[in-house]
Amino acid sequence: MAMAIAMLPALFSSPSILTSRIRCGATANSGGAISSTSSNSDPRRGVPLYKPKSYEVLATDAANSLAFALQDSKSRLEIDFPPLPSSISSYKGSSDDFIDANIQLAVTVVRKLQEKIETRACIVFPDKPEKRRASQRFKAAFDSVDGISIGSLDDIPGTSVTNFFRSIRSTLDFDFEDENEGTWEPKEPPTLYIFINCSTRELSFIEKFVETFASSTPALLFNLELDTLRADLGLLGFPPKDLHYRFLSQFIPVFYIRTREYSKTVAVAPFVLNYNGALFRQYPGPWQVMLKQTDGSFACVAESPTRFTLGETKEELLQVLGLQEEKGSSLEFLRRGYKSATWWEEDVELEASSNWRN
């Protein structure tokens, strides 16, 4: 965790355009709070400004939002925020760095959540080798939290064919028993299952795990970057799009930060304008479009009770910056293209639930 906390400033400090045209339901003040942990703020209102000072604060905000959702009897939940600074992308950085950061953050969120409500959390890994690796590397972290247990998607009862391939994998990976193997087995039924570090192919196994073990128990998808994984659904070798319609659509984002970098060409110097923004949500507050300021903070420019599409997020940022083309013009069409939303944002009528939009 020390590595992640030490590197936090890079996540919220890259250059951006500062604008005075901030329009939002909440009003920012010059000396206002820079995170939502203040006890004086109404959680149902959006934050005017967001800039957590550390990953500890970020985890606290995530745990607070999760606690509100659990108290409202929400059982299918999502938390998604950058586990490492934006200067380290998932392509440039080591995958182990992201895996380890997510484990540390998940444990921290559980610890913070237990300060709010009684929780017996089970962290579910993609497979037994990942579970075993975590038990070896994070033994002290798991021991520091009461009632925490760990499991894997391999715990799902399999067919004879599935069991055969699991035995092959175990042999090839030298998947031998470890002395810590049974240390964090659940002694009582968990009250919350947390799924971390899973890929697109493993989403269908999460669905089976939930059906088998968590049909009436809250389940949390933690930092899976679902928008990235959804893009693979329907492609050859991946689960079908129906997985989103029937399963992923049930998960309500309770704490969500998706940062993006944009650029806009203009006819005058400097000819290219760069700006950064984020789609932001803290349950039970509204969805918010945030514009990055020169001091690294994110200021609210628009909010809605329902989720903004990625295209709408960009349009809100362009509008507040005064860079939006004239509506209906040919230039607007050429810049936006024929479609400005993804298939999972468009196919409302096929969804079993609208929770993921709320």
From Swiss-Prot:
Gene assigned in the entry: LPA3
Predominant location: plastid
Species the sequence originates in: Arabidopsis thaliana
Coiled-coil regions listed: none
Protein's cellular compartments: Plastid, Chloroplast
Transit peptide as recorded in UniProt: 1-24
One annotated Gene Ontology cellular component of this protein: mitochondrion
Keyword Protease belongs to the record: no
Positions where N-acetylglycine occurs in the chain: 25
Secretion signal, residue range per the UniProt entry: none
InterPro entries, sorted: DUF1995, LPA3
Record has Cytoplasm as a keyword: no
Keywords from the UniProt entry: Acetylation, Chloroplast, Plastid, Transit peptide
Protein name: Protein LPA3
